[in-house]
């Protein structure tokens, strides 16, 4: 929430609603809305679990969906690393409740996106 406010956005915590993301963040300059799913990862973590609903939201709203990976180092949260868009190319089957993603792969995808936009 603080990182979104620092960007000049107006975030709202919607995590209790279980709608496929944790934060709805409005950019008052552009009028755009961002759907942000936050995943905190401790030192040494090698994966991130993403629920079926979060994946479906990323597929249905790829231009709005962002995965924010917040790494926890020595008990302190680092700045979020954002990965925008669909997390995979297809919807999980109904018997899949969550998928484990490799953390290094997600961070590499986020870095590649950042390089393209700079």
Regions picked out by a protein language model, each given a short descriptive name:
Residues 1-118:
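Mixed-charge (Asp/Glu-Lys/Arg
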């Amino acid at each position: 929430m603080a990182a979104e406010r620092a960007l000049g956005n107006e975030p709202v915590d919607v995590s209790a609603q279980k709608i496929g993301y944790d934060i709805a963040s409005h950019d008052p300059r552009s009028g755009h809305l961002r759907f942000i799913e936050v995943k905190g990862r401790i030192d040494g973590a090698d994966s991130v679990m993403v629920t079926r609903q979060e994946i479906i939201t990323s597929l249905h709203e790829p231009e709005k969906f962002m995965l924010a990976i917040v790494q926890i180092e020595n008990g302190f949260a680092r700045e979020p690393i954002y990965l925008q868009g669909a997390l995979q190319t297809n919807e999980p089957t109904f018997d899949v409740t969550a998928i484990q993603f490799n953390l290094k792969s997600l961070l590499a995808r986020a870095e590649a996106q950042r390089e393209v936009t700079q």
